[in-house]
Amino acid sequence: MECNAKPPFQWELENLISFGTSTAEVPRKLKPMEWEIDGFDCTSLYSSSFAYAGSSGSDIAHAFSKSSKSTSISSSSAEVRTHNFTSETGESLPGEFAKGIDTSPSLELSFGSGDPVLGLKLGKRTYFEDFWEVENAKGLGLPVTLASSSVSPVKKSKSIPQRLQTPHCQVEGCNLDLSSAKDYHRKHRICENHSKFPKVVVSGVERRFCQQCSRFHCLSEFDEKKRSCRRRLSDHNARRRKPNPGRTYDGKPQVDFVWNRFALIHPRSEEKFIWPSSKHVPSRVLMPQPAKTEISDTEHNRFGLLDPKTKTARAELFSKEKVTISSHMGASQDLDGALSLLSNSTTWVSSSDQPRRFTLDHHPSSNLQPVAHRSAAQLNSVSGYWQPDPPAVEGPTALHRNGVGQFNENYFSLNQFYN
């Protein structure tokens, strides 16, 4: 009776990659092995050469321990007989595989002839000179002898990083060692002296080192006696010359927060504000008046000083004022004649509401109309600098001795409100 069933160690041996002595052939021939069973002859297969490709050493030892056993079965008991496996070289395995098993075989893996390969262990991987990689080398204690002519590399390993080169100055003719220099000069590979030179030769081209860009530029990109290139200098100057945010921007008046008030700030320096004398402005109205000789019509139009609507409103106001004065004068002619005998300078005018006092010059009959004209002209000059139109005053107007027109108390309170 023949035993057709394959023992479990046969499946493990078939999965191993076996290498021969030549690279062209990868022999996978399996030689028959006799099993001694009482009353039966069973054959099994074993590999002529073994190779390790990615499995752990414990698996190989387990496979060899299984393959080393032969079974003898009798009707009464089963006897285990061991056979020694030997490779083509006939050498035995190290003692690690035979721990705890006195009868386990010993086998040494060899791949041709040659000296043992030196490897570099990085983490869990070991890298060899001919790109042969052995994983889990900690669990495998086999002295591997590898022939570079007989085995082709399976996987390319990472090359060993070379030692860092000592930095030197890249200027031609310098070649100064920068190992003891500053980090800045080591990084950009230039010595401290050549970083300030106006002209150096790098790779056969005349250049200059920019201390802000940290790069070499052509000589045309530098200004004379400047260590930074023209582009960096322009950016630096633009950052330094930023306009003050509290000042005028794009020719528009801005708010002055320094004095906690709204002020019209104009960029032109020729504008000057002066305080006029008290001869041209009423005593109760104080305001800054721009010099007429230094402000053109364009400037007046910009602030709305010569608006046609403003002119029309002022003309209507003055015409109403003249009519009011003349009507009051006509109604009180008799009283003027009586009072003129008592005083040449003071006249009382009767009105339906209440009497008003007029202060005239020495000749009231001849100077009344010119005083009214002067009052209108002075009102023109005073109210012309204010954009909002003042409301019309219906009541009579008091005229002082100095010949300057003045509105009633309502107009003065309005002027104080605008101030």
UniProtKB/Swiss-Prot annotation:
The keyword Secreted does not apply. Gene3D superfamilies: Transcription factor, SBP-box domain. A motif (Bipartite nuclear localization signal) lies at residues 226-242. Induction: Negatively regulated by microRNAs miR156 and miR157. Up-regulated by Turnip mosaic virus P1/HC-Pro protein, that acts as an antagonist of miR156. Its main location: nucleus. InterPro entries: SBP-like, SBP_dom, SBP_sf. A zinc finger (SBP-type) spans 166-243. Residues 77-96, 230-249 are annotated as: Disordered. Zn(2+) 2 binds at residues 210, 213, 217, 229. Disulfide bonds: none annotated. Binds 2 Zn(2+) ions per subunit. The keyword Coiled coil does not apply. GO terms for cellular component: nucleus. Zn(2+) 1 binds at residues 169, 174, 191, 194. The SBP-type zinc finger is required for the binding to DNA. Trans-acting factor that binds specifically to the consensus nucleotide sequence 5'-TNCGTACAA-3'. This is Squamosa promoter-binding-like protein 2. It comes from Arabidopsis thaliana.
